[in-house]
Each structure stands twice: as structure tokens, then as C-alpha cells.
């Protein structure tokens, strides 16, 4: 019986506090990606490129490229090209990226090209914020969308003016790294939390000795590390695999005002309240009537008279009671019982928070 109770208590403790690795909760300060950008040309399009008369920069770029290849275009030549498109190329330089390593690039049209499907990106230098070239991109573009048009009608699925080249850029310059320099490293929490920062510092101190880690603020934990790259790599690997008990998160409801989606975590609770939600709809219908004279030679004129009809409907919402809910399932069940649409639910949640019935932070993105 005692063993059973001990196992039950241990089960309750483990379910209440979930253990996670430090590497899943933090990142090393300074070890991050760097954005690269470049401007280039895509060729080989099946008549879906830029209209060069409306995008003069495409023709100018093509002339510059041809001149670098030793081809001179006569002055005043008006090239009507349909298989070339000017594009912007973006990529992310990973931390500790080495020369010869390949990275993915994203290609996006900046002109009026209809599609980049089947195109090939010509050699494009990718620069950082310091205007230095860190990678060279080139390759065939993979476009996830599809489209067709005929007789004035068109059908399109997903985006056609952007694509991706897997391993399409080669790193030519390495970023200088400060890793291994100094005797301290800073771990940054993914989400600021004073208690979590202190808990991580205490866990490191218990394993590595007192004074090995210090919580500087709600996001930063400073760790003392041995000097040298190899020693710091081994030390950091041991720290990242340590496990800490994750405390309950802040109750939060996130609302996307553009799509109408509502997402909430399991810490959200509701207090008892009463809600009445009414809908107001206005419909405007306009129809053009044609009035013609009865006698063709009477000198009358054909007149178009508009006829407008406005219909206003308001559906009254009855007062509904929402019970206090302490779990996420009960919260979802209570909100579904209101029968509100996602757009209505957004205003209901805002009103509930103002009334003090929603025990959560409301974030609108």
C-alpha cells in the first residue's frame, strides 16, 4: 500500500511539472543566423517573364551581365524579352558556416513576371549588412504553385512568383566568431521568465558547483566556462542536456485579426459570466432597369434607371450563462456553447477580459 501511494505521488508530481532539457528552453547568445540578400536574373521562363517595356531595370541588368560576358548590345536596341525576370534572392547564413557549405535560397520576383516555374537563377552574389559577399547562388527554381489560363479565364493554385532552390548557394566567406573567447557564455531563454531563469541557474550550480551560473535577468543566464573552443564545446554540451522542471506558463489567448483564428494554452480559465451577442447585417442590392420609348419615331430616348433596395436585419442574442471553467476542455466547451463565429468570438473574449471573466492575457496579432 505504501509503495502504491509513493508511486501515485510520484506520478502526480511528474505530471504537474514536466522536465525539459535546457537546450530546448534556451539558445546561446551570439550563436545565430545572419540574413543575406542579393539581386539577380532568372532565365528560361516559358513566356512568363517580365515585360521589359514596363520593367526597365530587367533590361539594364541583362545588358550589364552580357557586357561582363564580352557581348556588346548595340545602343538603342529595344529587346522584347519574355523569358527573363528580375528577382530578389534571400538566404540565411547559419552559425559556424564554413567555406564550401551549401545553404538554401528563396527566389522572389520583383517585376511583373507571371510565373517563375521552370526558370534558372543565374549566378547571384549574396551580401550581408556590411556589403560583403558571403555566398554565391545559382540553380533551378522549384515553384510549389501551378496555374493555367485560356480564353480570358485563369486558374491559379498557390504562389507562382516565388520559389526555392535547395542547396542553391555556396558559402564563400566565413563570419568571424567570438565563440571560445572569454570565460563566460550567456544563455538566453526563449521566453522571458524570472523563475525559469533562476531555476536553470540553480540546476547548473548543483551539477557544476556554486557560482557556475548566475541569472542576470528574466531572459539571460550567465555561465562560467573553461577557456578554449574544445573545452567550451564539451562544457556547453553537458549543460544543454541537463533537465529542469518547467513551471506552468502564463495563461494566454492569441487572436489573429486577419484570419479570425483563436489559440489558447491550457492555463486559460474562465469565471462565471453572462453573455449576449447580437448580429447586425446590412444588404444592399442595386439593379439597373432599362426604359425604352414605345414608339420608335416619337423622339424618345432610352433611359437607364437604377433601383436600389436596402435590407437591414438584426438577430437579437439572448443572454447566455457561462459557468466557471478550470480546464482547457471546459473552456472550449463553454465557448462552443455560445454558437459564435470566430470573428464574434474575438469580440466576446475582449469583452470577457474587460469584465474580468477571462483569466488570461489577450494578445492580438
Swiss-Prot record:
Q: Which GO terms describe its biological process?
A: bacterial-type flagellum-dependent cell motility
Keywords (alphabetical) are: Bacterial flagellum, Periplasm, Signal
Q: Which terms does the record give in the GO molecular function aspect?
A: structural molecule activity
Q: Which domain of life is it from?
A: Bacteria
Gene Ontology annotations for the cellular component aspect, listed alphabetically: bacterial-type flagellum basal body, distal rod, P ring; outer membrane-bounded periplasmic space
Q: How does it assemble?
A: The basal body constitutes a major portion of the flagellar organelle and consists of four rings (L,P,S, and M) mounted on a central rod.
Which cellular compartments is it found in? Periplasm; Bacterial flagellum basal body
Q: Which PANTHER family match?
A: FLAGELLAR P-RING PERIPLASMIC PROTEIN FLGI, FLAGELLAR P-RING PROTEIN
Coiled coil, from the record:
none
Tell me the leader sequence span: 1-19
User: Of which family is this protein a member?
Assistant: Belongs to the FlgI family.
Spell out the NCBIfam families in the cross-references: PRK05303.1
Question: What gene, per UniProt, encodes this protein?
Answer: flgI
> What is the name listed in the Swiss-Prot or TrEMBL entry for this protein?
Flagellar P-ring protein
What is the protein's major site of localization?
periplasm
Per its database record, what is this protein's job?
Assembles around the rod to form the L-ring and probably protects the motor/basal body from shearing forces during rotation.
Amino acid at each position: 500500500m505504501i509503495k502504491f501511494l509513493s508511486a501515485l505521488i510520484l506520478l502526480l508530481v511528474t505530471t504537474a511539472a514536466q522536465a525539459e532539457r535546457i537546450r530546448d528552453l534556451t539558445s546561446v547568445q551570439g550563436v545565430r543566423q545572419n540574413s543575406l540578400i542579393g539581386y539577380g536574373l532568372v532565365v528560361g521562363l516559358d513566356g512568363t517573364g517580365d515585360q521589359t517595356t514596363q520593367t526597365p531595370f530587367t533590361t539594364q541588368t541583362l545588358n550589364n551581365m552580357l557586357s561582363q560576358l564580352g557581348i556588346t548590345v548595340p545602343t538603342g536596341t529595344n529587346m522584347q524579352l519574355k523569358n527573363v525576370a528580375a528577382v530578389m534572392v534571400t538566404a540565411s547564413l547559419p552559425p559556424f558556416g564554413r567555406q564550401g557549405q551549401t545553404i538554401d535560397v528563396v527566389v522572389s520576383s520583383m517585376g511583373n513576371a507571371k510565373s517563375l516555374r521552370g526558370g534558372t537563377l543565374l549566378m547571384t552574389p549574396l551580401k550581408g549588412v556590411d556589403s560583403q559577399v558571403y555566398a554565391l547562388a545559382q540553380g533551378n527554381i522549384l515553384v510549389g504553385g501551378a496555374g493555367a489560363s485560356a480564353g480570358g479565364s485563369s486558374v491559379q493554385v498557390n504562389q507562382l512568383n516565388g520559389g526555392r532552390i535547395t542547396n542553391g548557394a555556396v558559402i564563400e566567406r566565413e563570419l568571424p566568431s567570438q565563440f571560445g573567447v572569454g570565460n563566460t557564455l550567456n544563455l538566453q531563454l526563449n521566453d522571458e521568465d524570472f523563475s525559469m531563469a533562476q531555476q536553470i541557474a540553480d540546476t547548473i550550480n548543483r551539477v557544476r558547483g556554486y557560482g557556475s551560473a548566475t541569472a542576470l535577468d528574466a531572459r539571460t543566464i550567465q555561465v562560467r566556462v573553461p577557456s578554449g573552443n574544445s573545452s567550451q564545446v564539451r562544457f556547453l554540451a553537458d549543460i544543454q542536456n541537463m533537465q529542469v522542471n518547467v513551471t506552468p506558463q502564463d495563461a494566454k489567448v492569441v487572436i489573429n485579426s486577419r484570419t479570425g483564428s483563436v489559440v489558447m494554452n491550457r492555463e486559460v480559465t474562465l469565471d462565471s459570466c453572462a453573455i449576449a451577442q447580437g448580429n447586425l447585417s446590412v444588404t444592399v442590392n442595386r439593379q439597373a432597369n432599362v426604359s425604352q420609348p414605345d414608339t420608335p419615331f416619337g423622339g424618345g430616348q432610352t433611359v437607364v434607371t437604377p433601383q436600389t433596395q436596402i435590407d437591414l436585419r438584426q438577430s437579437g442574442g439572448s443572454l447566455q450563462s457561462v459557468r466557471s471553467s478550470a480546464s482547457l476542455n471546459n473552456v472550449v466547451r463553454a465557448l462552443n456553447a455560445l454558437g459564435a463565429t470566430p470573428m464574434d468570438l474575438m469580440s466576446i473574449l475582449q469583452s470577457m477580459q474587460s469584465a474580468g471573466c477571462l483569466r488570461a492575457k489577450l494578445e492580438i496579432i
